[in-house]
UniProtKB/Swiss-Prot annotation:
Keyword Chloroplast included in the entry's annotation: no
Assembly information from the UniProt record: F-type ATPases have 2 components, CF(1) - the catalytic core - and CF(0) - the membrane proton channel. CF(1) has five subunits: alpha(3), beta(3), gamma(1), delta(1), epsilon(1). CF(0) has three main subunits: a, b and c.
Gene: atpG
Main location: membrane
Protein name: ATP synthase gamma chain
Family membership noted in the UniProt record: Belongs to the ATPase gamma chain family.
Superkingdom of origin organism: Bacteria
GO molecular function, one term: proton-transporting ATP synthase activity, rotational mechanism
């Protein structure tokens, strides 16, 4: 009977765990929909800023913003690592961290030092354990990221690049493909290449005739900074949508596994109960025969 009592306790424990994972699955599904809406809402802004910056850059070819100039003499590269603040999201962080380590090795083989900016607690903890130099960080963004919280940490890298101290700036994050698929990617933020200013069909954007106030250089300077900030925000929004999708899938898998474990334990319990009843009946029959 002690064995049956222990099995009942295990069944109850797994049932309670399944209730938790099921609730977390439902919460993640709700947050995923909101995160996807924010991700989609951010894209038109970045696209429009890119288009305007492209038009103005072509209209003023004599001016080259520092973001568009390669710092060939710099021996340090910057990486902005975007991860989650929380766990329980499958291999989401593992994949982007693995890709980041590979990028570190590639840059170091080229004689480049690497300085990082961490967005998310998981990435910050990893970089500290990895021994990387962390120049800035931002954690605990919550479910609704605001650009104001990101600007300070990101601006550190942008300023260093403008001063010619960084050879390039990369951003590592998890791109949202669909609910079941997310991809760890590393993209070059700076220097801005001509690909950044191409239309969606791959053709160069056409030039417009602008009247500038106060002047073209000041407007281009502001636009390019806003554009890079928009790219970072888009990466964070994509990462958050990926996080909630991965968490929903992970919690669903956990709930399904818990259901399987409960069924197996229930079968063991029934067999034990059947064996106990059979034993009792045998004892009763044996006792009656003895009388």
């Amino acid at each position: 009977m002690a064995g049956m009592k222990e099995i009942r306790g295990k069944i109850k424990s797994v049932q309670n765990t399944r209730k938790i994972t099921k609730a977390m699955e439902m919460v993640a599904a709700s947050k995923m929909r909101r995160a996807q809406e924010r991700m989609r809402a951010a894209r038109p802004y970045a696209d429009k800023v890119r288009a305007i910056a492209a038009h103005m850059s072509r209209a003023n070819p004599e001016y080259r913003h520092p973001f568009m100039v390669a710092n060939d003499g710099a021996t340090t590269a910057g990486i902005i690592l975007v991860t989650t603040d929380k766990g329980l999201c499958g291999g989401l962080n593992t994949n982007v961290l693995r890709a980041t380590v590979q990028k570190f090795k590639e840059l170091e083989e080229k004689g480049q030092k690497v300085e990082a900016t961490a967005i998310g607690s998981k990435g910050l903890g990893f970089l500290n354990r990895f021994g990387a130099k962390v120049m800035s960080q931002v954690v605990h963004l919550g479910d609704t990221p605001h650009l104001d919280k990101l600007i300070g940490a990101v601006k550190t890298q942008l300023d260093l690049y403008s001063e010619g101290k960084l050879s390039a700036v990369y951003i590592a994050y998890t791109r949202f493909v669909n609910t079941m698929k997310q991809e760890a990617v590393i993209e070059q933020l700076l220097p801005l290449s001509s690909e950044h200013f191409e239309a969606d069909d791959g053709t160069p954007a056409t030039s417009w005739d602008y009247i500038y106030e106060p002047d073209a250089q000041a407007v281009v300077d502001e636009l390019l900074v806003r554009y890079v900030e928009a790219l970072v925000y888009q990466a964070v929004a994509e990462n958050m949508a990926s996080e909630q999708s991965a968490r929903m899938v992970a919690m669903k898998a956990a709930s399904d596994n818990a259901k399987t474990v409960i069924s197996e334990l229930q079968l063991v319990y029934n067999k034990s109960r059947q064996a106990a009843i059979t034993k009792e009946l045998s004892e009763i029959v044996g006792g009656a025969a003895a009388v």
